[in-house]
Amino acid sequence: MMEFILSHVEKGVMTLTLNRPERLNSFNDEMHAQLAECLKQVERDDTIRCLLLTGAGRGFCAGQDLNDRNVDPTGPAPDLGMSVERFYNPLVRRLAKLPKPVICAVNGVAAGAGATLALGGDIVIAARSAKFVMAFSKLGLIPDCGGTWLLPRVAGRARAMGLALLGNQLSAEQAHEWGMIWQVVDDETLADTAQQLARHLATQPTFGLGLIKQAINSAETNTLDTQLDLERDYQRLAGRSADYREGVSAFLAKRSPQFTGK
């Protein structure tokens, strides 16, 4: 069986590399299944404290492999909603709910669902040559993989509409200027920069980082009153963590903390 997802765990970081470079790492059903299995390990293994996603070759991910759908213009219409429900919706939900930081290192073109997957990372770093393309409209489709929810939140309504309706390429530099991604780096430094950041996060109080992630995600739809209540509840949980005790102890003793993510 082909390895469409390359998995490597080191120093608390799981690096998952989308590995269909000849197809710009576009998804087929087997690639979806392999990614889902890898995510099970991230969810269950407490020693994995940060997830890094990237792509092999010159692309991050070109979205759905249309060759895998075998659309017959003269045959019955395919049920694309079933594909979304079976593969993309569970993927988006799992990454959003994962109580660990998710870094996306965008090494090249990210198109369609690949673009929304990339932009959905907690921290997104892109190579200078990377491009984001909301290619759905070119095929008569709507952005999925969380695209219609994500785009207005990372780009604002006007830019979200333009990106989704026109399907034009967006450069990494422009995405950074618009505040859609965290950082742009030279192509040759992307892998090292992303790994250094992932390893740093893996040494931090990741129990608290998970709460931060969930709180910020919840703020997108919560009222102020609801969010204040959530902050109270999450701060209570954080204050009971071993990492909080270690952080205070290290601060008072003027030493480097040794966080465990618990």
UniProtKB/Swiss-Prot annotation:
Induction: Activated by cAMP receptor protein (CRP), integration host factor (IHF) and by phenylacetyl-coenzyme A (PA-CoA) that prevents PaaX from binding its target sequences. Inhibited by PaaX. Its EC number is 5.3.3.18. It comes from the Bacteria. Keywords: Isomerase, Lyase. The keyword Isomerase applies. InterPro entries: ClpP/crotonase-like_dom_sf (IPR029045), Enoyl-CoA_hydra/iso (IPR001753), Enoyl-CoA_hydra_C (IPR014748), PaaB1 (IPR011968). It catalyses: 2-(1,2-epoxy-1,2-dihydrophenyl)acetyl-CoA = 2-oxepin-2(3H)-ylideneacetyl-CoA. Disruption phenotype: Mutants accumulate ring-1,2-dihydroxy-1,2-dihydrophenylacetyl lactone and are unable to use phenylacetate as a carbon source. One of its GO terms (cellular component) is catalytic complex. Pathway: Aromatic compound metabolism; phenylacetate degradation. One of its GO terms (molecular function) is identical protein binding. GO terms for biological process: fatty acid beta-oxidation; phenylacetate catabolic process. Coiled coil: none annotated. Belongs to the enoyl-CoA hydratase/isomerase family. This is 1,2-epoxyphenylacetyl-CoA isomerase. It comes from Escherichia coli (strain K12). The lineage of its organism: Bacteria, Pseudomonadati, Pseudomonadota, Gammaproteobacteria, Enterobacterales.
